Design a protein with these regions (language model features):
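Terminal connector regions
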Residues: 113-163, 243-272
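Short, hydrophobic/aromatic beta-strand segments
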Residues: 53-61, 69-72, 121-122, 173-174, ...
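Surface-exposed binding patches on compact interaction domains or structured appendages
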Residues: 26-27, 54-110
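Beta-sheet-dominated interaction scaffolds and their linkers
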Residues: 23-55, 60-61, 97, 173-184
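Short edge beta-strand/loop segments characteristic of extracellular beta-sandwich folds
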Residues: 44-48, 188-196, 236
């Protein structure tokens, strides 16, 4: 007897910290890409179906952690520490399931309720927006040797961090071990973003002349969360743009998180 098994392949847009004002995967667009909220506050996220057919999206709150390479990994709620899982009890959201017509958008409301006894600090969970697959659109099953047919249906999803700050957590950023290299004809900047304190840092990384104002290369939306003391960043550099400028170079990290007050960290970097 031939059997058919439907398997879902989840394609989630959360591997790296977001670098745009909108996060997108498939026909799903979410804005903003991050929320920072205080105790007993509220916010909203706009979900937009950019496709040409009606789609249903499920919304859930999940745990994620950052690695020193900047990737975002899933955390099992059952094994998470009490401190890491605390945000799940602080954050509320509605609705939890929406159906959008083509080019239609809807607002998801986010709320925070912090108990008076909650210790100060930064707490974080991630909102996962995931398209519900249409069974009718599933790929035709491919027959296997044992007579079982398997069909893979991609499920597109986007995650955004929801950061809750209780009290006034502090944080600071600095740069270390900056170096430029050329491999296979491609220039690349490597640098370690160092983070201190109990608050995440977030901003823009720039390579520029030591006395200049125009960046040679830029990457926006760089975050380092409290679980990492440092994050390694790799920034591709256009060799033509690099050759057009002379003199010493520097790397600059400009914090765009309002809590940082526009703090700037700089370090020199030698030419390759």
């Amino acid at each position: 007897m031939k059997r058919t098994m439907m398997m879902a392949a989840i394609v989630a847009s959360h591997a790296l910290a977001p670098t745009m004002a909108q996060a997108a995967a498939g026909d799903l667009l979410v804005a903003p890409t991050r929320l920072i909220m205080g105790a007993n506050s509220g916010g909203e996220v706009v979900v937009n179906n950019t496709g040409d057919k009606a789609t249903t999206y499920r919304i859930s709150l999940v745990l994620r952690k950052m690695t020193e390479q900047g990737t975002i990994e899933s955390v099992d709620e059952a094994t998470a520490s009490q401190r890491d899982a605390a945000a799940l009890d602080l954050i509320t959201y509605a609705p939890r399931k929406i159906t959008l017509a083509p080019q239609q958008s809807q607002t998801v409301r986010i709320g925070v309720r912090v108990p008076p006894t909650m210790p100060g600090g930064e707490y974080r969970a991630h909102l996962l927006f995931r398209a519900v697959p249409d069974v009718a659109d599933a790929a035709a099953p491919q027959p296997a040797a044992d007579g079982m047919s398997i069909s893979l249906t991609p499920i597109y999803g986007v995650t955004i961090p929801v950061i809750v700050r209780v009290g006034e957590p502090t944080g600071s950023a600095s740069l270390n071990n900056a170096r430029l290299s050329v491999q296979d004809g491609q220039a690349q900047l490597d640098v370690d973003l160092m983070r201190a304190g109990d608050r995440s840092v977030y901003g823009t990384l720039e390579l520029m002349q030591a006395d200049g104002k125009t960046p040679i290369a830029t990457i926006k939306g760089i975050a380092a969360y409290p679980e990492v003391a440092q994050r390694h960043i790799m920034l591709p550099v256009d060799r033509t743009a690099l050759a057009r400028v002379s003199g010493p170079l520097k790397v600059r990290f400009v914090e765009t998180d309002p809590a940082a007050g526009g703090a700037v960290s700089e370090t020199a970097v030698a030419r390759p």
